[in-house]
UniProtKB/Swiss-Prot annotation:
This is Biotin synthase. CDD domains: Radical_SAM. Its EC number is 2.8.1.6. InterPro entries: Aldolase_TIM (IPR013785), BATS_dom (IPR010722), Biotin_synth/BioAB (IPR002684), Biotin_synthase (IPR024177), Elp3/MiaA/NifB-like_rSAM (IPR006638), rSAM (IPR007197). SUPFAM superfamilies: Radical SAM enzymes. Binds 1 [4Fe-4S] cluster. The cluster is coordinated with 3 cysteines and an exchangeable S-adenosyl-L-methionine. Binds 1 [2Fe-2S] cluster. The cluster is coordinated with 3 cysteines and 1 arginine. Residues 59-286 form the Radical SAM core domain.
Amino acid sequence: MTTATISLSTLQASRPSVAARADAAARWRVADVEALYALPFMDLLFQAQQVHRAHFDANEVQLSTLLSIKTGGCAEDCGYCPQSAHFDTAVEASKLMPIDEVLDAANAAKAQGATRFCMGAAWRSPKERDMERVTEMVREVRALGLETCMTLGMLDGEQARELKDAGLDYYNHNLDSAPDFYGQVISTRTYQDRLDTLGNVRDAGINVCCGGIVGMGESRTQRAGLIAQLANLSPYPESVPINNLVPVPGTPLADAEPIDPFEFVRTIAVARITMPTTMVRLSAGREQMDEALQALCFAAGANSIFYGDKLLTTSNPQAARDRALFERLGLRVQGERPAVRTSDN
């Protein structure tokens, strides 16, 4: 039997159950994840929707807002990133944003319905002189009643503990791709560097936000390899952002061929099935997706988005457009009370 013709019942019998995944010895094999990808599209979405409904309200979406608190000039050579100092892009380097400007953005995000505020700095890793300011940002944003998330590059154990002591709820550090594709995109930071940072974050008691990027030229097997890596983290991340590559002029991936839209939906569904209780977040690339494709992603188990007009340096759908889509799909925003409808009759 080939993976292309494997039945749903056979796959369910062979792959680790949710209960078995609680055992650290139980792991997703890349072949099993690839077999999920190979299911008929409707079968895959049906299974993903079943898993989703078992753990979440299928008609609820969580909103996160992402702010670049330090843009450009990064020493890393990530081939997808316009903030890298290695590439000639339109991004201008900036210094770390003043705390009052961060708080203005956080208040605006909260007013628009975001429940989590993510702050990103284009660093290889934060310097000690910056830690006092970023920890103060965490404390001040948290005081507004928002969940806090940061992505600052690599962290050592002490830095992770400082962020935890400040009250940081989530730390984002993506794996980006499968190990066997990673070297084609990045040379200045190893895969193990990323895993070490995730370990430091876990050890400090901070929730992990970790995902990857599809559409960089990887194969389906390599997409399955990324999902397997994420699902086999012990435990798997509380949040998994799935990014659809936004090709940026001046970067090595500027001319990358776009991924098939149904393959992107399959990636969302496979992430949901392999990581049943995680928040699967639609991240970069939504501006290039039509509403029908986004609706399929929600049906496949996505239950979070980055909300707001900009993601670091790339565009994002306007908040009003997202709200209109939620209304048409009957999706409720997490943390908001349903609107009370009145009638003139």
